Amino acid sequence: MLAAIDFVQPAIDIIDAGIVLGGRRVRPGDVDLPWVGAVLRRNGVVEETGLAAGVQGDPAIGVAWLARKLAPWGERLQAGEVVLAGSFTRPVPAQRGDAFEADYGPLGRFTFTFT
């Protein structure tokens, strides 16, 4: 399955609004995915931490599951599609003016603000 994935990249799901992609793109074989950690800060305060192993033991498992579920319907994941493997942190409430920093260690750090 990993051979079919060009890269992995951190993402934050803004519930019912979209996603924020950040950090750096990494080939799946170049990082031990279950051990990727995250620290999410809101206005400088740590709100959530997590480990990618919290997504079915390995985020790639969820992507493989999705590919298998689509196949009987004649559907498949297409090149260039963004696939979210699942969150390993809980949602954090946000309001206008809140500034977030997401630190994914070897996959990089990025910031975003609600306006």
Give a label for each model feature:
Residues 4, 20-22, 65-66, 83, ...:
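Short amphipathic alpha-helical surface micro-motifs
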